């Protein structure tokens, strides 16, 4: 059988969540508002599949450069290459 090369392959530990979080999906995460220029951390919530970035970007920090519907455009550096990701607010956390 061939090896799987799916979207979430090789992410068993990266996307694992704690056994019993206090609230599975707090509504406050979904209604977060970010301004253009804010620095945000990309923290993938594996229980929400819409607007989820690729697991390779989990833990990266980027800058909000715009909005596309309910999602945000986040500019990051992947090595030397600049990339723009479309991510919903459930997977973002404001840098303090």
Swiss-Prot record:
Name assigned to this protein: Large ribosomal subunit protein eL21
One Gene Ontology term, aspect cellular component: ribosome
UniProt similarity note: Belongs to the eukaryotic ribosomal protein eL21 family.
Taxonomic source organism: Methanosphaera stadtmanae (strain ATCC 43021 / DSM 3091 / JCM 11832 / MCB-3)
InterPro entries per UniProt: Ribosomal_eL21, Ribosomal_eL21_arc, Ribosomal_eL21_sf, Translation_prot_SH3-like_sf
Single biological process term from Gene Ontology: translation
PANTHER family: 60S RIBOSOMAL PROTEIN L21
NCBIfam families given in the database record: PRK04306.1 (NF003303)
One of the record's GO molecular function terms: structural constituent of ribosome
Disulfide bonds: none
Keywords of this entry: Ribonucleoprotein, Ribosomal protein
Pfam families tied to this protein: Ribosomal_L21e
Origin organism lineage: Archaea, Methanobacteriati, Methanobacteriota, Methanomada group, Methanobacteria
Region ranges (Disordered): 1-22
